[in-house]
């Protein structure tokens, strides 16, 4: 019975820590650039694109496809940075818990 109570207490503590981590992640931002800084994006912790900067030299009709590719590349880089930061925070939170490798938490 004591073990069950201890597990319940640990679960509540973990739940509170996860909520705090989710709140912290929501306030994070990640910026990434492509094309040597010609395109820069900023993503919120939830992955929403919050800012986009484009160098005016790319505003040419014959360079639309290049611009599109640079925006996608910058966005993907920013998303990868956010995912890495979230994984690091999650790993520190769940250290010592028997979670299978590759298991993704629901946030």
Swiss-Prot record:
Compartment(s): Cytoplasm, Nucleoid
Classification via InterPro entries: YbaB-like_sf, YbaB/EbfC
Domain of life, source organism: Bacteria
Entry keywords, A to Z: Cytoplasm, DNA-binding
A Pfam family recorded for this sequence: YbaB_DNA_bd
GO cellular component, one term: bacterial nucleoid
Molecular function GO terms recorded: DNA binding
Role description: Binds to DNA and alters its conformation. May be involved in regulation of gene expression, nucleoid organization and DNA protection.
Quaternary state and interactors: Homodimer.
Family: Belongs to the YbaB/EbfC family.
Record-given protein name: Nucleoid-associated protein BMEA_A0033
């Amino acid at each position: 019975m004591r073990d069950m109570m201890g597990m319940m207490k640990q679960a509540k503590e973990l739940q509170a820590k996860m909520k705090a981590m989710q709140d912290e992640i929501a306030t994070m931002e990640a910026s990434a650039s492509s094309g040597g800084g010609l395109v820069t994006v900023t993503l919120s912790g939830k992955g929403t694109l919050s800012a986009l900067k484009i160098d005016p030299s790319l505003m040419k009709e014959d360079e639309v496809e290049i611009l599109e590719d640079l925006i996608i590349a910058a966005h993907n880089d920013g998303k990868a940075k956010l995912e890495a930061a979230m994984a690091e925070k999650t790993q520190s939170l769940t250290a010592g818990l028997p979670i299978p490798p590759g298991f993704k938490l629901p946030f």
